[in-house]
């Protein structure tokens, strides 16, 4: 499974990063991004805010042009996308490895990599045009903690092991559990970003959770007081699959 792109191991100099991100002649008022709300500086502290603003511009420019983000999403890019994903960093353990399944335009994987340089992030995406976009933005943002990998989660099962898996708007929970738990060490966590039907999805996934050897499942709310509505996560802790001893423990 080929690695499409890896960011250079170089930290940008202090100050804002301002590359040319799109064809300015085709940029219109409809996809000009709003100023970030004040809370964004808390979610993206220090240098992370410079990178976050550039990433938001990338999404609104090249991301819209390539069909990775709808133009109607641009006016709410901070609240609905950047901050909604950024608050997930609150529950990601320190110094971990994380795979973002079906990363798409990089939400939440790129956002988490910006906020948490201590976390090694793999952006897993099957479509070539998306992996090309992800590789370009990781290089522009100089995220040396990011790997872009073209492929599907089910193809990577038991070949790589991670501490955390994330996913946003990829597939129903039962299928996501089947794809993600084989990528996790025993005790690793799936953090699935879900909406108001999250509890219903958990009930519909009970059989798959048991078959996949899930140790526990719970609803977690993050970002209260920072985003409205707060972000809802389904957190699944991986156990040992029934009759399967392949899952690995984290090395200490």
Specify the residue positions occupied by each region the protein language model found.
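Residue-level preference for alpha-helix termini and adjacent loops
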Residues: 43, 67-68, 76, 82, ...
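Short, well-ordered helical secondary-structure segments
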Residues: 56-59, 70, 75, 108, ...
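Conserved SAM-binding loop of SAM-dependent methyltransferases across substrates and taxa
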Residues: 105-118
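Class I SAM-dependent transferase core
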Residues: 3-4, 8-95, 99, 129-146
């Amino acid at each position: 499974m080929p690695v499409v792109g890896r960011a250079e191991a170089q930290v940008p100099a202090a100050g804002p990063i301002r590359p040319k991100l799109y064809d300015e002649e085709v940029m219109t008022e409809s996809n000009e991004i709003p100023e970030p709300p004040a809370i964004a500086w808390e979610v993206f502290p220090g240098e992370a805010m410079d990178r976050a603003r550039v990433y938001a511009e990338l999404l609104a420019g090249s991301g819209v042009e390539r069909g990775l983000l709808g133009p109607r999403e641009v006016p709410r890019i901070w609240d609905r996308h950047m901050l909604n994903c950024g608050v997930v960093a609150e529950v990601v353990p320190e110094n971990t490895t994380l795979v973002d399944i079906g990363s798409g335009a990089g939400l939440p994987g790129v956002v988490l990599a910006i906020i948490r340089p201590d976390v090694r992030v793999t952006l897993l995406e099957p479509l070539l045009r998306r992996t090309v976009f992800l590789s370009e933005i990781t290089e522009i943002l100089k995220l040396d903690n990011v790997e872009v990998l073209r492929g599907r989660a089910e193809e990577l099962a038991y070949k790589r092991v991670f501490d955390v898996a994330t996913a946003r708007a990829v597939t129903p929970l039962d299928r996501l559990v089947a794809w993600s738990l084989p990528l996790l060490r025993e005790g690793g966590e799936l953090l699935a970003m879900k909406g108001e039907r999250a509890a219903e999805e958990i009930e519909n996934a009970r059989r798959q959770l048991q078959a996949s050897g899930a140790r526990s499942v719970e609803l977690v709310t993050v970002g209260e007081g920072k985003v409205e509505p707060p972000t809802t996560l389904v957190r699944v802790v991986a156990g040992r699959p029934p009759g399967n001893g392949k899952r690995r423990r984290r090395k200490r």
